[in-house]
Amino acid sequence: MYKRQVYNWKKEEVIGRDDLPKEPSANYDYAINKNLAYTVKNNLYVNGRQITNEPEGIVCGQSVHRNEFGINKGTFWSPKGNLLAFYRMDESMVTQYPLVDITARVGEVNNIRYPMAGMTSHKVQVGIYNPSTDKNIYLNTGDPTNRYFTNISWAPDEKSLYLIEVNRDQNHAKLCQYNAETGELMQTLYEETHPKYVEPQNPIVFLPWDDTKFIYQSQRDGYNHLYLFDTRTKIYPETHTSANGGT
């Protein structure tokens, strides 16, 4: 077991202690209000409480989509730490691929699930957990087959969640806003298509002094630029034909 201690530098005292599991897949994620999310094997825990109970082949709270599109983790606390967004990846339909562990005294085979080209890929959902009610909901994204849900971010008021959806052909990106309480799609703020590819790598970032404006990063003209958008203004789809890909 690991020990977690929260220290108040102003008061010069420890204000909290927790026992944490010693697991290679722990992926500890701390919220600003001291809430803690982590994974044990394929399930997600918050403050020591198991919040998912999935069988082998379904993984919660870990990175998905083979770490493409800037994805490097599977949990996302809201700005005040009151809600937790997380990935749920069903890879039970994906064939297993053997890897040899040469660090063992005698070599051992460890199987991973890896979709070969042209074969069935995993399916991803985005969940939201509320620690105060101990309830999970999942975004109503429709059938997740052949879709990438990337670059998750929160609205400053924690009432909505933003993500960038990419199709399997990776030439169409959509910036979507979902209701954090119901999981319903509120609006698609922006779309970008390209004949070659789009590659969103960064979530949107809201301006600290204006909750209605955010920065969106894109290579839509062939170069990486920052764009200022307004959540209250209709943004029409963009189609680009530059030599390089977009987003």
Region spans (language model):
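Short, small-residue-biased leader/transition segments that mark boundaries at the very start
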Residues: M1-Y2
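Short loop/turn segments that connect beta-strands within beta-propeller blades
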Residues: N8-E12, N130-D134, A180-G183, T231-K234
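A conserved hydrophobic secondary-structure block that centers on an alpha-helix together
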Residues: N8-I58
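Beta-propeller fold detector
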Residues: I15-D19, G48-E56, I137-N140, M186-E191, ...
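Blade-terminus and WD-like Trp-Asp/Gly-His loop motifs, strongest in beta-propeller folds
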Residues: N27-N35, T39, G74-L83, N151-S160, ...
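Short glycine/acidic-enriched loop and turn motifs that connect beta-strands
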Residues: N43, E91-V94, N167-N171, R220-Y223
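Predominantly five- to eight-bladed beta-propeller fold
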Residues: I51-T75, F86-Y138
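Short glycine-/Asp-/Thr-/Trp-enriched loop segments that recur within the blades
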Residues: G57-I71, D143-F149, H194-N202, N244-T247
